[in-house]
A protein has these predicted regions:
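Compositionally biased, low-structure terminal segments
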Residues: 3, 14, 47, 92, ...
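Short solvent-exposed beta->alpha transition segments
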Residues: 8, 12, 23-66
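Short, low-complexity N-terminal intrinsically disordered segments enriched in polar/charged residues
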Residues: 1-15, 19
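Generic alpha-helical secondary structure signal
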Residues: 17, 26, 30, 76-78, ...
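Exposed beta-sheet edge and beta->alpha loop/turn motif
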Residues: 54, 59-108
């Protein structure tokens, strides 16, 4: 089960990406995830999912479901025509600060 700090971090990560603040989003990743991603990589993947002409990304919210709550956090990124998502699979701590260790873009 994910705790409230982890849920808040997943939401803040999605909000940072939605604001196109890739540096802030990158800094929410732990060292392992940072070794696999760059700020430009985050931008490219996010903008291939949600292009610049998408419009407002609203709502940004956790969708909870007992079937998957033990496995991952599902953050909905709402749009006018359809929604997308960010799935956060795991967290780790760097110097006792919770960070995102593994995530993926897009709906399953």
């Amino acid at each position: 089960m994910f705790d409230q700090k982890q849920k808040s971090l997943a939401l803040e990560f999605a909000r940072s990406l939605s604001k196109r603040d890739y540096r802030q989003a990158y800094n929410m990743l732990n060292l392992n995830a940072q070794s696999q991603w760059t700020e430009d990589g985050l931008r490219e993947q996010f903008e291939s999912m949600i292009p610049l002409d998408w419009g407002d990304i609203d709502p940004i919210q956790l969708e909870e479901n007992p079937a998957w709550d033990e496995m991952f956090l599902y953050v909905v990124l709402g749009g006018d025509s359809y929604s997308e998502a960010i799935i956060v699979n795991s967290f780790a701590s760097d110097d006792e600060i919770p960070k995102i260790d593994s995530f993926q873009f897009g709906r399953p």
